[in-house]
Amino acid sequence: ILSFVFACLLALSAVSAAPEPRWKVFKKIEKMGRNIRDGIVKAGPAIEVLGSAKALGK
């Protein structure tokens, strides 16, 4: 499920917005998607550490 969401965010961020003012909403959505994608990328190592710690605890 996460990989599907990540692929959608990549596709959303790859769309280039036109310089017209009515595309401002799409630029905001693109920026939000970029922030979410960056957050997922930064959280990856922490999730791996938690998973390995949980495995060691068993």
From Swiss-Prot:
A Gene Ontology BP annotation from the UniProt entry: antibacterial humoral response
A cellular-component GO term for this protein: extracellular region
Cleaved signal peptide residues: 1-21
Induction (record text): Induced as part of the humoral response to a bacterial invasion. Transcripts appear within the immunized fat body.
Keywords: Antibiotic, Antimicrobial, Immunity, Innate immunity, Secreted, Signal
InterPro entries: Cecropin
Top-rank taxon, per record: Eukaryota
Location in or out of the cell: Secreted
Family from the record: Belongs to the cecropin family.
Biological role stated in the UniProt entry: Cecropins have lytic and antibacterial activity against several Gram-positive and Gram-negative bacteria.
Name of the featured protein: Cecropin-B
Lineage of the species this protein comes from: Eukaryota, Metazoa, Ecdysozoa, Arthropoda, Hexapoda
UniProt gene name: CECB
